Regions:
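Conserved SAM/SAH cofactor-binding pocket of Class I
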Residues: 1-90
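Glycine-rich, phosphate-binding/catalytic loops in enzymes
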Residues: 28, 93-96, 149-150
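Structural signal for short hydrophobic segments within the conserved structured cores
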Residues: 58-60, 102, 152
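Phosphate-coordinating loops and pocket residues in cytosolic domains that bind phosphorylated ligands
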Residues: 61, 98, 144
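Mobile active-site "lid"/loop adjacent to the S-adenosyl-L-methionine
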Residues: 82-113
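Conserved Class I SAM-dependent methyltransferase catalytic core
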Residues: 108-174
């Protein structure tokens, strides 16, 4: 059971629906809704205004954590980053092609952004904090990449899969592993 977090980060917010749900659930929390896509953030701002949550939800343009104030410590970071791998991207049905590619594609294994988030999150997560991340069908790739980590995979009564939770302590314990993947990604670009 998560207590009332003071500050929540919705990373890769898109239209802001997760940030809005979090603000509605945690009425005394401040929620930062972050995305790199200006168009998505415009939609998020409309949605935040529609739900009259401008006093609680702050919409921020940033490439992951890049433009977040260093002093911000979040008790909860929730993220639904792009996680579609290269093979699935190549075979997507036409209706998915209306989405911007950067909102879906995440490299060969679907985890390019997830590796970065796992590495960078401890710098913004409070010591008692929790990171919740959706990786969808890339769950198997994450388990293969980090077999020594016991991710806490969330289960739902009705649908949903590929969502894990990991604590600040676990992120710090495995930070060198995450750093190695980020270095590998950077060297391949």
């Amino acid at each position: 059971q998560l207590s009332q977090p003071e500050r929540i980060l919705d990373l890769c917010t898109g239209s802001g629906c997760i940030a809005i749900a979090l603000a509605t659930r945690f009425v005394d929390s401040l929620v930062d809704a972050v995305d790199i896509d200006k168009g998505a953030l415009e939609v998020a701002m409309v949605n935040v205004d529609h739900h009259d949550l401008g006093h609680q939800v702050n919409v921020i343009e940033s490439d992951l954590f890049a433009k977040l104030p260093a002093e911000h410590q979040y008790e909860l970071i929730v993220t639904n980053p792009p996680y579609v791998d290269a093979a699935i991207m190549a075979d997507l049905p036409p209706e998915f092609l209306y989405e911007p590619e950067h909102a879906l594609a995440a490299g060969q294994d679907g985890l390019d952004l997830v590796h970065r988030i796992l590495f960078e999150a401890p710098d913004y997560l409070s010591p008692e904090g929790l990171l919740v991340c959706e990786v969808g069908d890339s769950e198997w790739a994450l388990k293969q990449a980090y077999p020594e980590i016991q991710f806490d995979w969330l289960r739902f009564a009705h649908g949903g899969h590929g969502i894990f939770a990991i604590t600040y302590d676990e992120l710090m314990t495995h930070r060198q592993l995450f750093a190695a993947y980020v270095q590998l990604l950077d060297s391949n670009q």
